[in-house]
Amino acid sequence: WENRLRFGLEVLERIKETISIPVIVRLSADEIFPKGLKLDDMIRLSVALEQKGVDAIHVSSGSVCETPPWYFQHMSISKGKTWEFAAKIKSKVTIPVIAVGQINEKHDPEKILKDGLADVVAIGRPLIADPDFVGKVLGDIRSPIRPCACCLEGCIGGVRSGQGLMCVVNPEVGKEEKKLEKISKPRKVAVVGGGLAGMEAALVLRERGHLVTLFEKKTLGGLFNLAYRAPRKANLEKFKKYFVDEVTEKIDVIFEEAHPDKLMKNYETVILATGSLPKTPSIPGLKEWHWAEILEPDKTPKNKRGVIVGGGFIGAEIAEVLVKNGNDVTIIKRSEEIAPRMEVMSRNFLLKSLKELKVKIVTGADVVRKKGGTLYLSIDGKEGRIENVDFVVYTKGMIPENSMENRLKEKAELFLVGDCKEVGRAMDAIHSAYECALSV
């Protein structure tokens, strides 16, 4: 053990001899893989570091190579686990211990300090999602915190893809030079659709001074109301709730279907945020099918045999939920990859789960027809079949729902945002709505 520590401790001694500022060591309390460093090792290390004059210990978890979801505190990791590691180390040292990881709600810092889990909290991604996070926690700024979803899609994903730092919930990140300017001549604006794009557009328009009315025929949140029902995505409900609460408080919402004639008569500008619809299957004999609405608890079958047509992330996540409800599920997919466009850490968790659940996946295949309870397939040019099928879920993409566009575009200033313009991710919907609202 002493030999393992020697190099690091000698470097530390030299640093302490050279500088007079505090030295903080960040360490992973548990790397969460079989041959990785464990909590007992890191407690011993922390004690040794204190003896060598380290001023504080900053406690994270995971390994960037072996267990990145823990290292980056992905939403699939239970909140507070790393705080517990910090508390274990704190109980063995007298120097300050710093906790980190998913500290993204107003009560989190107070809980960590009050419960004695750590002496200091460190905050990273929540400041990307909401730069005023600290002021709101302290009560100096009295408005709701825009919560980091811990999804890693904009921040880590943006950097990895070469697009630069972004954020799903905060479209201003990376665009700080664009000022949200107040409008000199407010317009009466109707936003049609209360999904993520519609809510973001309405809030930004209102902040700029426009007179905004939002029309929603069902419930605020749109299709995103299904997103957090997928495995390991419960965190997304907080992010949706933030938008719904903000819109409910600040925007005039009319819960009814918008009619083009009334929109043209009563509003100067119309923003369509009507989202998208699932593609309709053209499979002979298939008269009834499901889409992601099957994730709603009262609509999820149990102990049945089902086939999912399409192996993108929506189809794959639905498969996981259905199997966990006792269903025998087969995914039919034309290409070889499952969920190829999914955020990488979420995808790795998903693929691991599908493997553990022994979900049957047939690639290179198409459904040719359905007759009775039998689905007939074409598998690499050969015929196959699945018998005794109780239900079919069709998840082969979405199409924009912009049926009002033609009636409105000739008589009103019209903008399209979100999926009704181009089907994309939650980040695409929010960012396109933000950009549009700045231009009105």
PLM region spans:
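Flavin-dependent oxidoreductase catalytic cores
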Residues: W1-V192, L196, A201-V204, V212
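Residue-level detector of alpha-helix initiation sites
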Residues: I103, G195-A197, T219, S276, ...
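Glycine-rich dinucleotide-binding loop and its adjacent helix/turn
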Residues: P171-I183, E256, P260, T274-N325, ...
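Hydrophobic Val/Ile/Leu positions in short beta-strands of Rossmann-like dinucleotide-binding domains
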Residues: V191, L214, I308-V309, I331
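Rossmann-like dinucleotide-binding cores of NAD(P)H-dependent redox enzymes
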Residues: L211-K250, V321-V367
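A conserved short coil-to-beta-strand element within the FAD-binding core of flavoproteins
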Residues: I254-M264, L277, T363-T374
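Glycine-/small-residue-rich beta->alpha transition segments that form the dinucleotide
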Residues: Y267-T269, A273-K279, V389-E401
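A conserved FAD-binding loop/helix module that cradles the flavin
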Residues: I318, M342-E343, V417-V440
